[in-house]
Amino acid sequence: MTQPANPRRPKRGTWTPQPETAALLRDSGNPINGVGENFPRRPSPFFWHPTDQHPFGDLQLIARKNSRKCPGSTEAFQAAYAYPELIEPSAERNEAPIEALTALVRDFALAHEADEVGIALMEPNWVFEGYTIEHPRVIVLALAHNYERLREVPSDETNGIGVCDVGDQYARGTRSSYNLANWIRSQGYQADPYPGPMAGALLLIPPAIAAGLGELGKHGSLISPRYGSGVRLAGVTTDMPLIPTMPRRFGADEFCANCQVCTQACPPGAITPRKQMVRGVERWYVDFDKCIPYFAEAASCGICIAECPWTRPSVRPKLLTTMARKLGGGLSQE
């Protein structure tokens, strides 16, 4: 069945930013993100970091203001910013075998709102410049969107369903990551939570990919084999001994190379057709200078992840089967 057109979505190529919005994009974000750089480096603080750490603070404030105009959005995001208190690590350490600790972490996270759990060894280039993370491991939590609510994006003063679901998943990420960090601390280990939507020390998508939660999509977001692009992420770094989960290849990257759905759905035309070199890695990249003005005006947008074929519950199983056949097997561990 064909889905009805969303009246809040302008067609690609028909949208231009308001003059006052365009005036706030005083610098290009693409060089700051490392587009065209051939050598790996740590990412620079960027959108959703404190506004004094990057040149786009005014646009960030406009994005938040427009988001909060949507019905229910303020309450949804207030829950995301309701950070529980962190306890001090216990003086008594749980010395169970690494296999048992890994199972305990996974079971605790899944019992406390996380929909998927992955574990990776920390990499220096996952930490933003100016920040420090000393812990050797990162646990990444995936929080799945409600598809029927997500497909309502973008939101505005008449309909806040989509952006409220974004806020709700970030709130689950806050609770889940803080609860897990406190549980790990209760076992005698160090642990720090890193939920969204505000950015902190930890870049979340690369460790999510390394931990087997998905692949990077053409739209610059994670594609999960279980939930498609309809996920939000939170992280917990720790010194607890844990067994890493392995990256998984299930065909999203190959599919994105030929798919044009998100490219055609993006009103400002920000999704590029080919991979680019970004901080020494050839990868999918979204043009920040085109994306963010629309993102700011459209209450945080979300069109690309809602329109992604992998996000549609009725389509995703067929894609998994088709791509597994093309790859010569099922989900693979690399």
Feature locations, PLM:
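Catalytic cores of enzyme domains
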Residues: E99, R106, D115-G329
